[in-house]
Amino acid sequence: MKILVDENMPYARDLFSRLGEVTAVPGRPIPVAQLADADALMVRSVTKVNESLLAGKPIKFVGTATAGTDHVDEAWLKQAGIGFSAAPGCNAIAVVEYVFSSLLMLAERDGFSLYDRTVGIVGVGNVGRRLQARLEALGIKTLLCDPPRADRGDEGDFRSLDELVQRADILTFHTPLFKDGPYKTLHLADEKLIRSLKPGAILINACRGAVVDNTALLTCLNEGQKLSVVLDVWEGEPELNVELLKKVDIGTSHIAGYTLEGKARGTTQVFEAYSKFIGHEQHVALDTLLPAPEFGRITLHGPLDQPTLKRLVHLVYDVRRDDAPLRKVAGIPGEFDKLRKNYLERREWSSLYVICDDASAASLLCKLGFNAVHHPAR
């Protein structure tokens, strides 16, 4: 049994070798010749999986180690009788922590308190729900918009997108990309929406590039609209609008979900799905794969305020480390993908063990996802 795996899927070679012969390949462009005798294909979002790639090939199963699936033609796979699995929620924590790192940086730079801001969350799936929970743990007001979930009657106080635009100081997008249909998200943030944002608002896109109309956004910024922008995703990736990058406050190379934990979850989820598909079901404990974190433990004295939270968050991950490299190479062919391929190891907040002498600080840090314990000062 031959299994092709994306060379940037951590732990894939070790895990899938339990099931068959493993060959690691680049995801973009994928070497088509390797598909001629392969039984399974494991990809990331950079690989377009469709009829033109797989027609006439012996592939029986496709797994994507990503939460999003807009790069996969699921309807064709089903029609062709090819098994499929994604990894929903695998990188949700990573994306939430990317958003926090960005907001805390902007808050420090511009001198505002997040506690005084209202955050509008568009898309309340795995990422949006976790972001809401962490913001509300801090006492930060949130507004939710998710028409599909609202129409299904899912639990939640859902508001219209127009209301979020009018009321939110921070608007962050966490939707799939739907190019048509009743819940179309292509250019959901169009020129009209962008121009309607509150003066001084923060716009964040860490889902799919085309959810925000990049041309319209650049037009508004060039005209002097007072707006802070965080973009991790871009229309036309791996190409991007270099002039837009120059205008945004934070720009990164589609790496919001790139924690070691998130990548490992993606790999293990598709591994478990494929093992079940072939009748040799196996399960993997994530902590048996991960290395020891760079910082073993830290001691925190006193309560948790915004500056202290910012220092803790940036000790684990400061978004600026990913902004600067993209600006250096933007517009050079191939460099966007190189940044992703050679991404520096990044951990999640749970990797940091925090000893607190303040019980409320320990409790709050746990709610935020840190590995925190309370030890009273002696």
UniProtKB/Swiss-Prot annotation:
GO terms for cellular component: cytosol. GO terms for biological process: 'de novo' pyridoxal 5'-phosphate biosynthetic process; pyridoxine biosynthetic process. Its main location: cytoplasm. Keywords: Cytoplasm, NAD, Oxidoreductase, Pyridoxine biosynthesis. Belongs to the D-isomer specific 2-hydroxyacid dehydrogenase family. PdxB subfamily. Homodimer. Catalyzes the oxidation of erythronate-4-phosphate to 3-hydroxy-2-oxo-4-phosphonooxybutanoate. This is Erythronate-4-phosphate dehydrogenase. It comes from Escherichia coli (strain K12). The gene is pdxB.
